[in-house]
Amino acid sequence: MAPDGAPVDETGTLVHESGGFLLKRDRGGTFTLDLRRTPVDLVEKRVRITGWETRPGHVDVEGIQKYRY
């Protein structure tokens, strides 16, 4: 069963800020990310995330990986 909210499949730059993580989206804007693990090896790198937008601007991340153009 899928979580409540809209599915998300986005690319951008992973940023560590204020004790949490943000995705600076390639399409503009940001998402605040709820992550199950701390992806220190991906900070300040381009990534692709998948998950669910649980409330406006907040994503429960199911997957995160390094992304190339």
Functional labels for PLM-detected ranges:
Residues 1-69:
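OB-fold and OB-like single-stranded nucleic-acid-recognition modules
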